[in-house]
Amino acid sequence: MTSPALTAASVTPSRNTTSPDTTSHRPASVGVVSPVFLRFDEPLPLASGQSLNAYELAVETYGTLNAERSNAVLICHALNASHHVAGVAAGNPKDVGWWDNMVGPGKPVDTDVFFVIGINNLGSCFGSTGPASTNPETGLPWGAAFPVLTVEDWVRAQARVADHFGIQRFAAVMGGSLGGMQALSWAITLPERVAHCVVIASTPRLSAQNIGFNEVARRAIITDPGFHGGNYYAHDTVPHRGLAVARMIGHITYLSDDDMAEKFGRTQREPAENGAYRYGYDVEFEVESYLRYQGEKFSRYFDANTYLLITRALDYFDPARATGGDLARALSSAQADFLLVSFTTDWRFPPERSRDIVRALLKNGSPVTYAEIDAPHGHDAFLLEDARYHAVVSAYYERIARNLGLTRQAEESAA
């Protein structure tokens, strides 16, 4: 392993420059994209002791895999995202990839250089096998019988996608939030298959407060009369109310107090005459209207059982549990170089949690670059376009490309 290296960057411009970049010049998109569905018939053993005998994963790819298969980047998604990382979904021009500002030609993860893979995690509800899928043993939706999953289970399933493409080692595995946990797990469980690990706005384990938020959200779903013990599919209903409340709770944790104050403050939605309160329990403030809208929208496209499953996977993630709480020991198997990025107003996974990872890596002598970005947008900052944040990621991937002997010009010449 190379000698220890730390590049620390705490980027703190004035507040009026921290909004997402809205410049007129933008790199190109990867264009219109469609997923492929990969079926795996080899049983997948799970951390719970159960196994899945067969399953499908929805996958999108961008860019070109080189002859050496050395330029592949895996993007891992967070709770409610999917394989659709970049570009515009075929047949739905409004469906733009959740990280389209990060992945594409000339973007920080440059698809003129790298072959990028997005995978919808096992148990999710966007095409991969999950609770809403048919259980082959019963001919009915899995529902509550779908096995509980962990981040490590996802990594093992993702590794089979890499095998499908003949990729022995990723140039980088990258993710934000829960996606960052998956990237970290890759570096620990399959160290020989990860050259660089990019962990953004993440944590090595959830705090009691975060587990508490997840539990309140789950109880909102489970106690909804439409939940039916997780077998609501058979009743032709959905626990909309519980899922909407769960999303409202989660959404608050994704925003910072500063961001909410700027967006909503105490502005009333439709004040009575002369700005008086309406003295009732319907929507009074703009923030209430916004949260109700977000909750209702979410409940129309996301599966409630998937929400339970993924939040529990979040709770269970704790790689240092096996080493008596010693994170450095848990990370001692890692062979990758690391980039960690945190955001000052992220109170869901605050910068101190990223620093915990950095300190553990330095203790092991692992090369690590760390950037702490001063941004007002809270946890969601990792999804937004910010010139300083993107510059950090761009510079890191340019370094990866140089180390691999890849440049945009070289790729174009090879083509």
Curated annotation (Swiss-Prot):
- Active site at 177 (nucleophile), 346, 379
Q: What are the AB hydrolase-1 domain coordinates in residue numbering? A: 71-386
Q: Check the record and name the InterPro entries matching this protein.
A: AB_hydrolase_1, AB_hydrolase_fold, HAT_MetX-like
EC code: 2.3.1.46
Give start-end positions of Polar residues composition bias: 1-26
Molecular-function GO terms, alphabetical: homoserine O-acetyltransferase activity; homoserine O-succinyltransferase activity
Q: What class of enzyme is it?
A: transferase
* Domain of life of the source: Bacteria
Subcellular location(s): the record lists:
Cytoplasm
Q: Which reaction does it catalyse?
A: L-homoserine + succinyl-CoA = O-succinyl-L-homoserine + CoA
Site residues (Important for acyl-CoA specificity), renumbered to this chain: 348
Main localization (coarse): cytoplasm
Residues annotated as binding substrate are 247, 380
GO aspect biological process, one term:
homoserine metabolic process
Subunit arrangement? Answer: Homodimer.
- What is the role of this chain? Transfers a succinyl group from succinyl-CoA to L-homoserine, forming succinyl-L-homoserine.
Q: Please give the name of this protein.
A: Homoserine O-succinyltransferase
